[in-house]
Amino acid sequence: MRSALLVAVAGLAAACGTTGGDNAATAPAKSPKKQRGCPSALVRVAVMNGDTHRPVKNATVGIGRAVHRTNVRGFVWHRLKCRRSVPVRVSAKGYLGKVARPPFKQRRRVVVRVYRKALQWTMYGATPERTQAHEHIAIRPPFRVAWSRGLGSLIEFPAVVSEGYAYIGNMYGAIRALRMRDGKVAWRRNLRQKMASSLAIHGDKLVVHTMRGRVWVLKRSNGKVLWSKYVGSPIESSPIVRYGIDYFGTHNGRVYALDLERRRFRWVRGGNCKITSSVAISGRTLFLGDYCGRVLALNGRSGRTIWVRGVNGRVYGTPAVLGPRLFVPSSTGGSLTAFSTRGRYLWRVNTGSYVYSSPAAWGGRVFFGSYNGRMYAVGASSGRVLWTVRTGGRISGAVVVVSGVAYAGTRRRIVGADARSGRVLLRFPHGDYVPVSGNGRRLLLHGFSRIWAVDPKRRR
């Protein structure tokens, strides 16, 4: 009887414990502990221009379902229900979009850097027309060296640059991603195949051509090989990607249009003359030269020949298009020849020595170098030589124009001259092939096997 009474009392106590007013608060006792484990937080996101370090106002910032606009200081504030890393989507007019995962758990105030599209250098020649001229970067001599990095062996073609990183390969196919801020190597990928061309940036991918006749596509963030395609002949032509199609020529004389999404050829144009020239694009027309001394104009969609014209020798370098004119270098002809983009002959400048240099076209002028050691400035419409500058050695690579300064590279020297007057503004004690690339923050000067990142010197 006594034991039964104790059981009944215990049962009544248990029932009261689950329903009684004083004890009801103990049921959700664990819930506040969960909140303490992931508390809410007011966080600040600052959107900055990655090249200039200036705030980006009126940028759209998406955090979860919420959408904000940055103020004049580039800030947005947002209350997170749970303080943890979440995707932040940033877009702004003229800038490359970005998705980041800032460490909100560690910091309440974070910075997301975005980059103006016009200040990147995503292909050899700077533009689809291969003008070798960057009109938006405003960096001029005198310079100070910010950092330098050895690359192990010959670098014949320049780095491409996007979103704070430079991508460059050496002669033996070792590709590096270098942080523009300090030159730190972000990753390295050794393809173990010789290279004689620049890379091209296509979204989050890198397109690479090698002398073993293979096209490689790498993941830009870590250098992982995504896929490759064999074409059967060495590729010295630097890639150019338009609407997802990579256009290039090969040593066996063929021209390819490779669809990078479908991983198959859109078309292939046969030929029997060696091609080292890269493709220049204007509108829907492709332009390139070959070792038979011809310049070809092809339809980009079909590969159909639009017209063919001859110059006075082999075409090693890459043509440049400026408006309605096409400028074609000839190595063995020692000349630069101008045509209209419809194929009409306009003029020719003879130098008396090899012209391997690809021309730069800017401001109504054309700039190129010769094995005679001179850099030339020529009127684009008249063909009249406006000035020449002695560089002290043979010029093999392209002339490049940035912010009104024309640069040419020779053995152990880069010379920069005012594009209007020809006055020499820079004599840098390193150089070899193509001298310059860069972004809106700094320029990269290219030597034989090392690059130097330079900033403008502050004038006192």
PLM regions with names:
Residues 145-149, 184-189, 224-229, 264-269, ...:
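A short beta-strand motif characteristic of beta-propeller blades
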Residues 45, 61, 65, 120-128, ...:
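Repeat-blade elements of multi-bladed beta-propeller folds
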Residues 117-145:
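Blade/loop signatures of beta-propeller domains
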Residues 75-87:
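Short Pro-Gly-centered beta-turn/loop motif in secreted/extracellular proteins
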Residues 85, 89-105:
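A short, solvent-exposed loop/turn motif at the edges and junctions
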Residues 179-183, 219-223, 259-263, 299-303, ...:
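Short loop/turn segments that connect beta-strands within beta-propeller blades
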Residues 17-42, 48-50, 108-115:
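Beta-strand-rich domain onsets/edges
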